[in-house]
Amino acid sequence: MSEFLADGAELFAGICVRDYEQARPWYEALLGMPPTFLAHETEAVWEVAPHRWLVVEQRPERAGFATQTLFVADLDARVSAAAGRGIEPADEEVYGEGVRKVIYRDPEGNEIGFGGNPSAAA
């Protein structure tokens, strides 16, 4: 875990769910790791990069409306690893110059995307 506020800022991106007990293992499989810490019994926090956190919290009144995107260095490796853990994408988008976004939807409809630039070989 990175030193908190070492560079002066931390980003916490939230995802609200109705069923935390169902959501937490799904996010563990998607991200390939357990939470970095548990804020309380219905809130899990993953450090997805230094000073960048993904928060999954039980808040039924706000569940199902999140849209988060993480750009990663090796999109294909990320997608393959998630598939190996039983998590398959719902969709894929391709933008100008070959930039891609692979979209996952959790059991409650929240959208988590992984983005990547085209490979140098392309």
Please place each PLM-identified region on the residue numbering.
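Mid-chain, well-packed structural core segment of small domains
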Residues: Q68-I87
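Short beta-strand micro-motifs in enzyme catalytic cores
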Residues: T42-A44, Q68, G98-V102
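A short, compositionally biased micro-patch
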Residues: Y20, A39, A49, L75, ...
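Conserved short beta-strand elements that form part of the metal-binding/catalytic scaffold
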Residues: M33-A66, E111-P118
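Vicinal oxygen chelate
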Residues: M1-A6, I15, A83-A122
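N-terminal beta-strand motif that seeds the catalytic metal site of vicinal oxygen chelate
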Residues: M1-R24, H51, A66-Q68, P118-A122
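Short secondary-structure junctions
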Residues: L31-L38, I87-E93
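Conserved active-site tyrosine of GNAT-family acetyltransferases
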Residues: A23-E28, A82, G109
